[in-house]
UniProtKB/Swiss-Prot annotation:
Catalytic activity, reaction form: tRNA(Asn) + L-asparagine + ATP = L-asparaginyl-tRNA(Asn) + AMP + diphosphate + H(+)
Protein name: Asparagine--tRNA ligase 2
Molecular functions per Gene Ontology: asparagine-tRNA ligase activity; ATP binding; catalytic activity, acting on a protein; nucleic acid binding; transferase activity
Assembly and oligomerization: Homodimer.
InterPro entries, A to Z: Aa-tRNA-synt_II, aa-tRNA-synth_II, aa-tRNA-synth_II/BPL/LPL, Asn-tRNA-ligase, Asp/Asn-tRNA-synth_IIb, NA-bd_OB-fold, NA-bd_OB_tRNA
HAMAP family: Asn_tRNA_synth (MF_00534)
Species: Lactiplantibacillus plantarum (strain ATCC BAA-793 / NCIMB 8826 / WCFS1) (Lactobacillus plantarum)
Subcellular location: Cytoplasm
Main location: cytoplasm
This protein's GO CC annotations: cytoplasm
Keyword Membrane among UniProt keywords: no
Entry's EC annotation: 6.1.1.22
Protein family according to the UniProt entry: Belongs to the class-II aminoacyl-tRNA synthetase family.
This protein's encoding gene: asnS2
Any single Pfam family the record assigns to this protein: tRNA_anti-codon
Length: 432
């Protein structure tokens, strides 16, 4: 009996007759030979149908079968040094499983809106396939890293009665007889987890009702948010850079084929595994920007041009430390010798991708935190449980958040964050 295999396992079956379930992505043919571009979800490769070596029925089927038709392919695996994948199948038999008439995404250039309208089908194409495989590796690597580091995975609620970031950019819904919101962050709940279990991380969807159309913003995105008890900011920075380097190395080790499809330079990625990452203060960043003709004043948050310059200046991810208190959320710990900055850091990625991590040491003083909640215009009653964490055995603790899609945009060198999530939710798009 002929063994059924996945395309990705072709290397283990050279010169063997196998059976593969696949879809046709493209084809070309002459009078004597037909070339079928095939995919099965595990990889892409070529099927070669030689007229003199198959029945007339099989050769005619190879010429007539339509794009994205599904079929069983039987044939012999051979090495193919001309392709990135390295293998092909010499086809002996074809059985069509599912027809595909007038597939809308033809092998030509299509506009962004057209491809987003057909995202459910565009996911089948090579570039989205490669990105989603890298996404899967980053998720796998996240669990491996934090398990090795002794963290517990904790699930934070998606429906909340308060806003962790202290903003009004919330999706509102009714929760029986009161208001509720879709979560902007799991951080506050992760802090409770850290004081219970020592080290925790949350990983789940978050929602920001930001009316932004930039290439770096999604309405719905996924966040990894670790929190660590008995830990100060410098220790947290060390965890952060180890985590990033671990993820990048995992992509290099396990996603070479996907990186080849994307044309991503592995040597560039290797630079990002070298630790430690540079650290500069916000004050130093302002001076560096001014020296290079940026019109910036102390107290402003950095935009994309400033973040791009700073990271590219070091040609590495760079930590910018201790931002002004006025532009950061209420829960950050004040600086011990200055009342105008907080103990925090953003990690900026090079190549124009900007902030991928935001983190801080958390405020531990009950009265200070209560005052900050009031100054942010928030209702202290909504945060009574959070304030309790400072009443009963408060300890130094720190944490950070990494936006999965922003990280992936950098690693895959994509132009827009929408390409790194299967079904992006944008300001004017909630379909499909």
């Amino acid at each position: 009996m002929v063994q059924q295999i996945n395309i990705i396992d072709a290397k283990d079956h050279v010169d063997e007759k196998v059976k593969i379930g696949a879809w046709l992505t493209n084809k070309r043919s002459s009078g004597k030979i037909a070339f079928l571009q095939l995919r099965d979800g595990s990889a892409f490769f070529q099927g070669v149908v030689v007229k003199s070596q198959v029945s007339e029925e099989v050769f005619e089927l190879a010429k007539e079968v339509k794009q994205e038709a599904s079929m069983w392919i039987t044939g012999v695996i051979h090495e193919d040094s001309r392709s990135k994948f390295g293998y092909e199948i010499e086809v002996e038999d074809i059985v069509v499983v599912g027809e595909s008439e007038e597939y809308p995404i033809t092998p030509k250039e299509h506009g962004v809106d057209f491809l987003l309208d057909h995202r459910h089908l565009w996911l089948r194409s090579k570039r989205p396939w490669a990105i989603m495989n890298i996404r899967n590796e980053v998720i796998r690597g996240t669990y491996e890293f934090f398990n090795q580091e002794g963290f517990i995975k904790m699930d934070s609620p998606i429906l909340t009665g308060s806003a962790p970031e202290g903003t009004t950019e919330l999706f509102h819904t009714e929760y029986f007889d009161r208001d509720a919101y879709l979560s902007q962050s799991g951080q506050l709940y992760a802090e409770a987890g850290a004081l219970a279990y020592g080290k925790v991380f949350t990983f789940g969807p978050t929602f920001r009702a930001e009316k932004s159309k930039t290439r770096r913003h999604l309405i719905e995105f996924w966040m990894i948010e670790p929190e660590m008890a008995f830990m100060h900011q410098e220790q947290s920075l060390e965890v952060q850079e180890r985590y990033i380097a671990f993820l990048v190395q995992g992509v290099i080790d396990h996603c070479q084929y996907a990186l080849d499809i994307l044309g991503r330079d592995v040597e560039t990625l290797k630079k990002y595994t070298k630790l430690p990452y540079p650290r500069i203060s916000y004050d130093e960043a302002i001076e560096l920007l001014k020296e290079n003709d940026f019109d910036v004043d102390w107290g402003v948050d950095f935009g994309s041009p400033e973040e791009t310059f700073l990271a590219d200046h070091f040609d590495q991810p760079v930590f910018v430390l201790n931002y002004p208190k006025a532009i950061k959320p209420f829960y950050m710990k004040p600086h011990p010798t200055r009342d105008d900055v907080v103990i925090c850091a953003d990690l900026l990625a090079p190549e124009g991708y900007g902030e991928i991590i935001g983190g801080s040491e958390r405020a531990t003083d009950y009265n200070y935190l209560l005052d900050q909640i009031k100054q942010a215009g928030l209702n202290p009653d909504d945060y009574a449980w959070y304030l309790d964490l400072r009443k009963y055995g408060s300890v130094p603790h720190a944490g950070f958040g990494l936006g999965l899609e922003r990280f992936l945009t950098w690693i895959t060198a994509e132009d827009h964050v929408r390409e790194t999530i299967p079904f992006p939710r944008l300001l004017n798009r909630i379909y499909p």
